[in-house]
Amino acid sequence: MAATPRKERAMGVSVGLIELHHIPLGYETVDAMLKAADVELVRASPSCPGKFLAIVTGGVGAVECACAAAQRTAGRQAVVCRAIDHLDDAVAEALKARPRPDKLESFGSIETRTALSAILAADLVVKASRVRLICIKMAQGIGGK
């Protein structure tokens, strides 16, 4: 039996992510990102002991500009700093979500070592299969995973 074709989704969302080893510098880095480009702040908070995670969304150029500003500000304190272009819209929405699903037929969960790999894995899953992302929870209260 042939698989049902997956619904086409818009793919043009960009996400910028920086993780640092220095919490106060994290806030300074977020300030630089928001001043450098027209991006939306999704998250800016300590993620686990001694680390800080910031995530922004926006157009490709704006997110790349914000990430460049973040890298300049964070310098060697950055664990990872990356602009991820052309994500499925569902991934960006799941990053912002506070889930309260009505009814689930089934449930899947992926655990990753880094926040960046969680976003990349979610994008691959939603582009390759017929799933609905509910949320992406990253690096808070779960040992940085």
Show which residues each predicted segment covers.
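N-terminal structural module
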Residues: 19-38
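A common structural junction motif
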Residues: 37-38, 70-79, 129-130
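Acidic-enriched and Gly/Ser
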Residues: 66-67
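Helix N-cap motif at beta-to-alpha junctions
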Residues: 57-63
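A structural signal for small-residue-enriched, beta-sheet-centric alpha/beta enzyme cores
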Residues: 2-22, 42-51, 79-114, 119, ...
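Short glycine/serine/threonine-rich phosphate/pyrophosphate-binding segments
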Residues: 26-27, 63, 118-121
